């Protein structure tokens, strides 16, 4: 019984939501889309912000990304 439930849960989580990082990424994507029509310079920092939030668990990777964007 537990095995079946785990399998179902895994399949449900493997959806697009998991791929996008859950609602967290979705929330950050909303403002990013609003800034899309704006200048390209705004897109750079905005994108980094979204990635930074996603890489909150990896401070090392976050630092590298921030430096690269700068």
Curated annotation (Swiss-Prot):
The lineage of its organism: Eukaryota, Metazoa, Chordata, Craniata, Vertebrata. Belongs to the paired homeobox family. Bicoid subfamily. Disulfide bonds: none annotated. Residues 45-70 have a biased composition (Polar residues). InterPro entries: Otx_TF_C. Induction: Up-regulated by FGF2 treatment in embryonic telencephalon primary cultures. The keyword DNA-binding applies. It comes from the Eukaryota. Transcription factor probably involved in the development of the brain and the sense organs. Can bind to the bicoid/BCD target sequence (BTS): 5'-TCTAATCCC-3'. Keywords: Developmental protein, DNA-binding, Homeobox, Nucleus. Residues 34-70 are annotated as: Disordered. GO terms for cellular component: cytoplasm; growth cone; nucleus; protein-containing complex; transcription regulator complex. This is Homeobox protein OTX2. GO terms for biological process: animal organ morphogenesis; anterior/posterior pattern specification; axon guidance; cell fate commitment; cellular response to leukemia inhibitory factor; central nervous system development; diencephalon morphogenesis; dopaminergic neuron differentiation. It comes from Rattus norvegicus. GO terms for molecular function: DNA-binding transcription activator activity, RNA polymerase II-specific; RNA polymerase II cis-regulatory region sequence-specific DNA binding; sequence-specific double-stranded DNA binding. It is found in: Nucleus. Pfam families: TF_Otx.
């Amino acid at each position: 019984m537990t095995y079946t439930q785990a399998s179902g849960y895994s399949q449900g989580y493997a959806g697009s939501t998991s791929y996008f990082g859950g609602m967290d990424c979705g929330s950050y994507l909303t403002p990013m889309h609003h800034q899309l029509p704006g200048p390209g310079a705004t897109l750079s920092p905005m994108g980094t912000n979204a990635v930074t939030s996603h890489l909150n668990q990896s401070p090392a990777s976050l630092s590298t990304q921030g430096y690269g964007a700068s």
